[in-house]
Amino acid sequence: MSEILTKSRARNVFYGGSLFFIAVFVGLTVQSHNYVVSTTPALTDEVILGKHVWERNSCINCHTLHGEGAYFAPEVGNVMTRWGVLDDPDAAAEMLGGWMDAQPSGVEGRRQMPHFELTDEEKRGLSEFLRWADQMNTQSWPPNDAG
């Protein structure tokens, strides 16, 4: 009869198992937090401004950022690498500003980006936000580098 699971044994199994998995959860949470903090570039005021520009203009309604968002326009999580300006903040701001100023291009039958009335400071902030996003260690996600 000692093989029967009594109420007290069942309670002990439940509490013991619960405590074990809570400890595992807390440990994995701490490990994940430490990993993200150590591999993500630091936020600057320009990056924060760029994130606000990104959100205020609802860029995610057309673009994806690391696979999140709409698939109407190109992925922009790696756009600075594709343009070859990841390591040059001035060239990145100039490239993005020139692209945005040229929109919409007026080419018939092609998806068009609306013209946003952004200041030079906002364009610089947006380029810094996209450079920051491009420098994140996404562990090769999304798998499509073409954008």
UniProtKB/Swiss-Prot annotation:
Topological category with respect to the lipid bilayer: Single-pass membrane protein
Xref: InterPro entries: Cyt_c-like_dom (IPR009056), Cyt_c-like_dom_sf (IPR036909)
Statement: the UniProt record of this protein carries the keyword Heme: yes
Keyword Transport: yes
Ranges annotated as spanning the membrane: 13-29
Keywords of this entry: Cell membrane, Electron transport, Heme, Iron, Membrane, Metal-binding, Respiratory chain, Signal-anchor, Transmembrane, Transmembrane helix, Transport
Residues reported to bind heme c: 59, 62-63
Location of the protein in the cell: Cell membrane
Domain of life (superkingdom): Bacteria
One GO cellular component term: plasma membrane
GO MF: electron transfer activity; heme binding; metal ion binding
Function summary: Component of the anaerobic respiratory chain that transforms nitrate to dinitrogen (denitrification).
Record's protein name: Nitric oxide reductase subunit C
Underlying gene: norC
